[in-house]
Design a protein with these regions (language model features):
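Structured alpha-helical segments in the cores of large, soluble enzyme domains
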Residues: 1-10, 28, 47-57, 88, ...
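Active-site cavity-forming subdomains of large catalytic enzyme subunits
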Residues: 1-155, 178-185, 231-240
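Function-dense linear segments that define catalytic or interfacial modules
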Residues: 7, 89-187, 192, 199-203, ...
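Internal maturation/activation junctions in enzymes
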Residues: 12, 69-71, 161-184, 188, ...
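Glycine-rich phosphate/pyrophosphate-binding loops
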Residues: 14-19, 207-213, 372-373, 397-410, ...
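Terminal amphipathic helices with adjacent charged low-complexity linkers/tails
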Residues: 33-36, 48-59, 103-130, 193, ...
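Catalytic alpha/beta core of large soluble enzyme barrels
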Residues: 123-125, 169-174, 256-260, 269-276, ...
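Short, Gly/Pro- and small/polar-rich lid/capping loops
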Residues: 261-272, 415-464
Length: 529
């Protein structure tokens, strides 16, 4: 975790890591709650590898053995363990769930590798030393006659674009400089790539379909089928030109779960000419890509908000506020002006979780790797309804399930302000944006005081941290520092008041610890956990 904090890209984005554990490991109960302390494992995503046998035991309310190296350490109620996973996810948004048997059964390379983990976002199940090579096709840009009865996706253009993308991504395998030789060998022996889509929700809107509807589910599966078919045929063509990937064996490859349902002419072509890339399709989050592509919807996610305001850094260092409009909404405005949006323009907040799951399952039918998708749940969803989301994901064939339920513990990654016809009177400036209201201070708080020694100071420092309990969860609320040493007193008071102000805003405040741990006194000493 500490190592990962040293990694930074784009000036601010930290690294990310994934930790997984099988549901039958003896330590699984501790693993499930590993991130209930917000200050721990900040750089990790954690997921439980769920087996088919475990899910069957959950359904039948059977027993489940926790085993390691052939020895059974404990036998637990399968349903009880499942409820522990669900409760932690309900409260803390982790761990995620990965249906590992399903992943290995569908893997084109099942004859030469076993998957035990995915990348942090979950769209790439990978073997040891496996690497992600991801790309996306923007479906929204391929819609013809948008918002018209004749609106449709240009199938020919899609096939051509997919073919070009596969060729480009295959070249990247050879052009990449991998940090480790084992990574280079793994990549070039199998040549796996992950071509996906972005702008799906916008494309559906532009052909007049509501995300999550039966029509949209069917359309999504059809488009993904077109992408998969074109990608596999393009890879066969590359195999004819450059040779199949080194570990290719036709019969075991074609016997995999993913290939069994592939079109017969594609299977025949693979059997005859081989295939250049072992796996070809994957759907990544595409958050940054979607912005570059005109603010299209991300991956296969629904539109989160149709318009919002961003502060954009200018060349002179100033910032200007600009309205950012969803691509489909902009296309609607260009065509119809200020005409009200049709009722099929739904967003992530108004969709039922079941609609999310149906869309993920529809796309998964033609994705040989996996999908990064978040199923947004309302804060007031009941625990039983929440558990049903995961059971639905399993029954519909998803390879994993990730949910997000905003609450006082986790906060909210993104939020959409509610609008009203009458704006409340306020003496605040119009440019002030309130992310959240401060928590009220109870009359009495529980806390702890710690006696600390600081280098070069003969007087002890007394650090007091008071906590508040919200929805049954304890979290820091305020911090004080007292000492007979008056050196830097004003700065110390100012710092603790600012830290306390952050605590009172709620949400995940563990970043405060990470920031202060990077501050060192040149005379010795540091802010440490």
């Amino acid at each position: 975790d500490s190592m990962c904090r040293t990694i930074m890209s784009a000036g601010s984005r930290r690294g990310a890591m994934m930790a997984t554990m099988r549901c039958d490991h003896p330590d699984i109960e501790d693993f499930i709650t590993a991130k209930s302390d917000a200050a721990r494992l900040r750089m990790f995503n954690v997921s439980v590898l769920i087996t088919d046998a475990f899910m069957e035991a959950v359904k039948s309310d059977g027993q489940h053995d926790l085993v390691f190296d052939g020895q059974t350490y404990k036998t637990v109620s399968a349903r009880g363990l499942w409820d522990k996973i669900m409760q932690s996810t309900y409260d803390y948004a982790e761990p995620g769930v990965i249906f590992i048997d399903r992943i290995n059964r569908a893997n084109n390379l099942g004859y030469c590798e076993t998957i035990a983990a995915t990348n942090p976002c979950g769209e790439q199940p990978l073997p040891p030393y496996g690497a992600c090579l991801l790309g996306s096709v923007n479906l929204a840009r391929l819609v013809e006659n948008s918002f018209d009865d004749a609106a449709q996706l240009d199938a020919g253009a899609l096939a051509d674009l997919v073919g070009t993308a596969v060729r480009m991504m295959d070249n990247v395998v050879d052009a990449s400089n991998f940090p480790l030789e084992a990574q280079a060998q793994e990549a070039r022996a199998k040549r796996r790539i992950g071509l996906g889509v972005t702008g799906l929700a916008d494309a559906l809107l532009m052909v007049g379909q509501r995300y999550g509807s039966d029509e949209a589910v069917k359309q999504t599966e059809d488009w993904q089928h077109q992408v998969a078919r074109a990608a596999y045929l393009a890879s066969v063509q590359l195999a004819k030109e450059k040779g199949a990937f080194p570990l290719f064996e036709a019969e075991p490859f074609l016997a995999s779960g993913a290939m069994e349902k592939m079109d017969s002419d594609v299977r025949d072509a693979i059997r005859k000419d081989g295939i250049r890339n072992a796996l070809l399709t994957s759907i990544a989050p595409t958050g940054t890509i979607s912005l570059y592509a005109g603010n299209v919807s991300s991956g296969i996610e629904p539109v989160f908000a149709y318009a919002y305001t961003r502060k954009v850094l200018q060349k002179d260092g100033s910032r200007s506020e600009e309205e950012v409009v969803d691509y489909a909404v902009q296309m609607w405005r260009d065509k119809f002006g200020d005409t009200e949006l049709p009722d099929y323009f739904v967003n992530a907040q108004t969709l039922a979780p079941a609609d999310h799951v149906k869309m993920q399952a529809a796309a998964q039918n033609w994705i040989d790797s996996s999908i990064s998708k978040t199923i947004n749940c309302p804060e007031d969803i009941s625990f039983q309804e929440f558990k049903d989301v995961y059971l639905q994901a399993y029954e519909l064939g998803c390879k994993g399930c990730t949910t997000y339920r905003p609450n006082a513990v986790t906060g909210s990654v993104l939020s959409v302000s509610e609008t009203s016809d009458e704006a409340p009177e306020s003496d605040q400036g119009a440019d002030v944006i309130y992310m959240s209201e401060p928590l009220d201070r109870p009359a009495a708080l529980d806390g702890n005081t710690y006696k600390l020694r600081w280098p070069d100071s003969e007087h002890a420092i007394y650090l007091t941290v008071n906590d508040v309990v919200i929805n049954g969860h304890r979290r820091p609320f305020e911090v004080f520092i007292n000492s007979k040493n008056m050196e830097h007193y004003a700065w110390t008071v100012a710092l603790t008041r600012m830290i306390s102000a952050v605590f009172r805003r709620g949400g995940d405040v563990s970043f405060v610890v990470e920031e202060l741990k990077a501050v060192f006194d040149p005379r010795g000493g540091a802010w440490i956990k």
